[in-house]
Amino acid sequence: MAPGKKVAPAPFGAKSTKSNKAKNPLTHSTPKNFGIGQAVQPKRNLSRYVKWPEYVRLQRQKKILSIRLKVPPTIAQFQYTLDRNTAAETFKLFNKYRPETAAEKKERLTKEAAAIAEGKSKQDASPKPYAVKYGLNHVVSLIENKKAKLVLIANDVDPIELVVFLPALCKKMGVPYAIIKGKARLGTLVNQKTSAVAALTEVRAEDEAALAKLVSTIDANFADKYDEVKKHWGGGILGNKAQAKMDKRAKTSDSA
């Protein structure tokens, strides 16, 4: 036989021969009994029996309820968030227009005061500031007046009723909008802990092209799919035990 080649396995498999090893008569096998009050139980995943802190318990219950119950399309649309790459580009643009901090504002006003004292206009000392707009009522009024160029909505606002109408309002007014994962991430854009919404009303000339590109990508994911998303309900997914029970019932009905 040529070197490197293996013999084909037997078609029906070779019968295994039992090894007759000599056993030590002094040792006895002691199979474990895992019944109640018997041997120490093997390690298992017991996280579902843990008594979690109340805030964790509420988070878990809320998550499970949103999966089990049927969720109307208006609320279910908040589970479709902006993809990671587009979100990174969006945050990169918005970070250029973060509102000024108290120290930055003080410095700007000092420069303006010095310029006015020298007989110049305050525009010479500091150019017009561009900033991200935030605050629910403020952003809603900007959308209604069609001043917002891009609106970001957080997907985890509680209660959700605060922002549930915003996608419909943006669609009606023709304002581009995107649903972003995490109100805390929006908060970083406006120097706050959290923010339900953030909007851009105007950008500098050098960022116009980047904004236009972002808007076209975001519209393809949200505004253009709005009518399709309205048709789909969320939730209604059974747990493992309930699913197994349904499968068993279906199997018995098929066999009958």
From Swiss-Prot:
Keywords per UniProt: Cytoplasm, Ribonucleoprotein, Ribosomal protein
Region: Disordered, residue numbers: 1-37
GO cellular component: cytosol; cytosolic large ribosomal subunit
GO biological process: cytoplasmic translation; maturation of LSU-rRNA
Molecular functions per Gene Ontology: RNA binding; structural constituent of ribosome
Primary subcellular site in the record, as a coarse category: cytoplasm
Keyword Repeat tagged: no
InterPro entries referenced in this protein's UniProt entry, alphabetically: eL8/uL1-like, Ribosomal_eL30-like_sf, Ribosomal_eL8-like_CS, Ribosomal_eL8/eL30/eS12/Gad45, Ribosomal_eL8/Nhp2, Ribosomal_eL8_euk
Localization in the cell: Cytoplasm
Subunit composition and interactions: Component of the large ribosomal subunit (LSU). Mature yeast ribosomes consist of a small (40S) and a large (60S) subunit. The 40S small subunit contains 1 molecule of ribosomal RNA (18S rRNA) and 33 different proteins (encoded by 57 genes). The large 60S subunit contains 3 rRNA molecules (25S, 5.8S and 5S rRNA) and 46 different proteins (encoded by 81 genes).
Extra information: Present with 80200 molecules/cell in log phase SD medium. There are 2 genes for eL8 in yeast.
Family indicated by similarity: Belongs to the eukaryotic ribosomal protein eL8 family.
Task of the protein: Component of the ribosome, a large ribonucleoprotein complex responsible for the synthesis of proteins in the cell. The small ribosomal subunit (SSU) binds messenger RNAs (mRNAs) and translates the encoded message by selecting cognate aminoacyl-transfer RNA (tRNA) molecules. The large subunit (LSU) contains the ribosomal catalytic site termed the peptidyl transferase center (PTC), which catalyzes the formation of peptide bonds, thereby polymerizing the amino acids delivered by tRNAs into a polypeptide chain.
Annotated protein name in UniProt: Large ribosomal subunit protein eL8B
UniProt organism field: Saccharomyces cerevisiae (strain ATCC 204508 / S288c) (Baker's yeast)
